[in-house]
Design a protein with these regions (language model features):
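Histidine-/acidic-rich catalytic cores in large beta-rich domains
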Residues: 1-421
Length: 421
């Protein structure tokens, strides 16, 4: 029962230059078919690797091609795993890949057999053999429902349902899902539902750990090879034993603890809410016990609630400094709060640091969109925004606006590396 097999959108992948000119686009017909289970699915998780080629995944496959269309590999997911989406990460030290997938045929504690939803990180070697997996429904608490009850049911990643716009779930509705065997790509608690919605995975080579972003727990979480949680960057509400001693304590720039009540903290510090791309900042700053984390804070259910007016919502890019020994977190940079609802991007988006330029890229995927929920159509199409910031700068050095467009994520593409790796 369940799964996210129906998550299938025709791919539109393009490279543009800084003047807005299209320089390359993918012709996917030879590797993609909307009507074929094994060749359908939403293409996501694009990354340019050190050799200049791009890797990504879609549906029941993960692939790697160079910019001229030469296949390096295009493989089905191993048996027992299904429904790739959102994220892949190559471990440069050994050539392994981390793929965000799901478990196919998981037997729950109540003996119900389900296909889980966006809650497994699979590790495969360079030949596609299974090395390890992180079954998050066993590592985390799939019944922590604080965020699930607060998020807007009308917009969950790329799933948009006009009938549910502005609505939230109750504890009673969540409980009935188990009673009614209601499984699948739906917001809900427990394995077999979209309780985690992991949308990014990173690897920390210093301690052989993964870092995940869980949209539906509004948390960025580090997990060791032993499958034990190392720390949780997110609101402290709803976490039970044994997770309570893994929660990071907010501090100011002087190391003084910041007081939080519920999910709201004093001063400018804030957690991320339904965030994307919780990634390690790979620079000289991240060393020893200190690690910097960047994220795109989408901002739905901020403070574990819906605001009085939808126009009060905003998104932001944010960078945190985590002291893994002291178990503290300091917010060192944010951008977007001052732009207000005009830059609000409730779904997708990205924040990422690039060491070659010592800068951060921010992609606001659905900024500027206005939607008529009665006709289920845009009254104003999104205008995604690409910003580049010098490290911790208050204003962007570069800003590109894609008028009347849609796109899941974006990243800088190195043409020289593509042709001269």
């Amino acid at each position: 029962m369940g799964g996210a097999l129906q998550w299938n959108y025709s791919p539109q992948n393009t490279i543009i230059d800084t003047t807005g000119e299209i320089r390359w686009y993918m012709l996917p017909e030879t590797i993609y078919s909307f009507d074929n289970i094994w060749y359908g699915g939403t293409m996501m998780g694009f990354r340019q690797e050190a050799d200049g080629a791009m890797s990504w995944g879609y549906g029941q496959r993960y692939a790697k091609y160079d910019i001229m269309g030469r296949e390096i590999f295009n493989r089905r997911l191993p048996t027992g795993y299904a429904d790739f989406s959102h994220a892949s990460k190559k471990i440069e030290s050994n050539g392994h890949y981390l793929l965000r997938v799901a478990s196919d045929g998981y037997k729950r504690p109540d003996n119900k057999i389900v296909r889980t939803v966006r809650d497994v990180v699979l590790e495969v070697d360079g030949d596609g053999n299974v090395v390890d997996d992180f079954r998050l429904f066993e590592i985390l608490d799939p019944y922590r429902d604080n965020v699930l009850k607060a998020i807007d049911q009308g917009a969950v990643c790329l799933n948009i349902d006009p009938a549910k716009q502005g609505k939230t779930l109750t504890a009673e509705e969540l409980a009935k899902q188990d009673q009614n065997d209601h499984f699948g790509d739906i917001v809900g608690s427990g394995a077999g539902r979209n309780w985690a919605h992991v949308n990014s995975v990173d690897y920390d080579e210093t301690d052989d750990s993964i870092i995940i972003s869980s949209r539906h727990q509004s948390a960025i979480i580090k997990i060791g090879r032993d499958k034990k949680v190392k720390w949780i960057l997110g609101s402290h509400e709803g976490w039970k034993t044994p997770y309570q001693d893994k929660l990071l304590q907010p501090v100011d720039k002087n190391g003084k603890p910041i007081k939080c009540e519920g999910s709201k903290c004093e001063g400018d510090f804030d957690w991320t809410w339904t965030q994307h791309t919780g990634w390690k900042v790979r620079s000289e700053l991240s060393k020893g016990d200190v690690i910097y984390i960047s994220a795109f804070d989408n901002g739905d259910a901020r403070g574990m609630e819906q605001p009085a007016l939808p126009e009060m919502k905003y998104s932001r890019a944010v960078v945190y400094k985590v002291d893994q020994k002291k178990m503290t977190v300091e917010q060192v940079w944010e951008y977007g709060k001052e732009r207000g609802h005009a830059r609000y991007s409730p779904v997708t988006s990205l924040t990422e640091y690039y060491g070659d330029k010592d800068s951060s890229m921010v992609y606001s995927a659905t900024a500027g969109a206005e939607f008529d929920w009665k006709t289920f159509s845009y009254t104003k199409f999104p205008s995604p925004v690409i910003d580049e910031f010098k490290w911790l700068a208050k204003e962007p050095s570069v800003e590109i606006i894609l008028h009347g467009a849609e796109g899941y994520q974006a990243f800088p593409f190195d043409v020289k590396k593509a042709f001269h790796p």
